[in-house]
């Protein structure tokens, strides 16, 4: 049997028996491997030992259950901790905050399924990050997880290093090089921009002080969208000076046409909608300006200090695409974060209109760009549905985006 399938069996066994005592013998019995060999494979595929991985999963499942009516002490005991105090210490050590602060501050989502057969999924432990820090003379800094302030999910590719820096890592050197070009990077001791460690590449950037934009804030004060629109335009003006040959060239229309039949079946789209999409968007696509864009302007990638905009972050996905894409993606990302709370269309419409108005204050959008906005928004959802539907861990996101696409078709 393929090694990955064997490790996937262990991953599923751990989740299915998360409240039971799981011994090293049990895991070795499932795999037929020695524990030393199993540890090596776990580190290779998941970036952690089996015991480290099990502890993290127990903590995540336990804090998820704390949204219910069962007492914290009982939940801690059910997940293998002798006392709540022991659970508390383990949780704070792993996530950098107390369980109560976590459940109060972040959405209580069930831990998603991890399937290494479907996609690369590398969990880099804080211990490994700590070992890298001497390369930057930051060995005395505390490594802390970065938590999405809207979803409560931990970042899968970055950590805070002390209070002043952010470390990012990836197996994709191209993504790392984009950030080197667009962020303020801290050089290594040998003056290199990034560190290669096995298949992973690491960089450290100076932290932007402030907080991720919270969807509740922009829903309560849609004028924030004016500020965002202005700063998207300012970012685009800066990005015009970069050589587009250094970045991927993308065509959102072609991407959607390639996925439309699949999404049509998944979302039960009408022939009328699909034909109109192909004809009207197809006739406009060549009239739209393209340039280097951010590509991932979602609330967690916008840093604010109160109402003052500080910066966009995370340029992993930057590419050459439609200029209007960033505005449309920002609007759909905000909608996605609050969609299950039955957002009022009039509020969301005000947000997207303010994004456009803010952008126009700095750089005028063309008549064709304004006309094509609904189709770019539909396109973003079509691409998201096609992507998310491939992975188990995004099952709920697939359903949400299908509902969003239908809602958008009806309203926009």
List each language-model region with its residue ranges:
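Terminal helix-turn-helix DNA-binding modules in bacterial transcription factors
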Residues: 8, 12-17, 21, 25, ...
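Sequence-specific DNA-binding recognition helix
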Residues: 23-31, 35-42, 68-103
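Conserved NTP-binding catalytic cores of kinases and kinase-like/nucleotidyltransferase enzymes
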Residues: 118-190
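Active-site acidic catalytic loop and adjacent metal/ATP-binding pocket
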Residues: 150-163, 167, 279-325
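ATP-binding pocket architecture of kinase catalytic cores
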Residues: 162-242
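A cross-family kinase active-site recognition segment
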Residues: 215-269, 290, 320
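Active-site activation/catalytic loop segments of kinase-like enzymes and analogous catalytic loops
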Residues: 324-363, 378-394
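ATP/Mg2+ or Mg2+-diphosphate-binding catalytic cores
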Residues: 383-412
């Amino acid at each position: 049997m393929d090694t990955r399938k064997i490790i996937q069996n262990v991953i599923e066994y751990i989740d299915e028996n998360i409240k039971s005592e799981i011994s090293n013998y049990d895991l070795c019995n499932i795999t037929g491997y020695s524990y030393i060999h199993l540890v090596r494979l776990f580190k290779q595929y998941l970036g952690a030992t089996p015991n480290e991985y099990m502890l993290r999963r127990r903590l995540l499942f336990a804090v998820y259950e704390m949204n219910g009516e069962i007492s914290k002490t009982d939940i801690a005991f059910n997940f293998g901790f002798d006392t709540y105090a022991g659970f508390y210490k383990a949780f704070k050590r792993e996530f950098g905050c107390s369980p109560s602060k976590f459940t109060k501050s972040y959405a209580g989502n069930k831990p998603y399924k991890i399937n290494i057969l479907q996609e690369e999924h590398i969990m880099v432990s804080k211990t490994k990050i700590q070992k890298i820090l001497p390369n930057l003379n930051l060995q005395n800094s505390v490594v802390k997880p970065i938590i999405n302030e809207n979803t409560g999910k931990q970042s899968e590719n970055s950590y805070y290093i002390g209070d002043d820096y952010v470390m990012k890592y990836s197996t994709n050197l191209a993504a790392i090089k984009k950030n080197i070009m667009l962020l303020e990077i801290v050089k290594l001791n040998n003056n290199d921009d990034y560190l290669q460690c096995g298949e992973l590449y690491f960089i450290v950037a100076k932290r932007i002080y402030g907080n991720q934009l919270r969807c509740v804030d922009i829903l309560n004060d849609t004028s924030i969208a004016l500020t965002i629109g202005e700063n998207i335009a300012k970012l685009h003006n800066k990005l015009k000076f970069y050589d587009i040959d250094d970045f991927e060239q993308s065509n959102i229309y072609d991407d959607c046409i390639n996925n439309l039949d699949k999404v049509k079946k998944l979302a039960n789209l009408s022939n009328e909608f699909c034909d109109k999409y192909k004809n009207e968007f197809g006739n406009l696509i060549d009239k739209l300006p393209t340039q280097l864009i951010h590509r991932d302007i979602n609330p967690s990638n916008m840093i604010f200090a109160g109402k003052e905009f500080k910066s966009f972050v995370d340029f992993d996905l930057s590419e050459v695409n439609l200029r209007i894409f960033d505005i449309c993606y920002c609007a759909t990302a905000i909608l996605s974060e609050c969609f299950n709370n039955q957002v009022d269309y009039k509020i969301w419409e005000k947000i997207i209109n303010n994004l456009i108005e803010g952008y126009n204050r700095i750089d005028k959008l063309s008549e064709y760009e304004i006309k094509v906005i609904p189709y770019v928004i539909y396109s973003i959802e079509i691409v998201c549905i096609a992507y998310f539907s491939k992975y188990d861990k995004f099952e709920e996101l697939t359903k949400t985006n299908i509902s969003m696409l239908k809602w958008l078709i009806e309203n926009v």
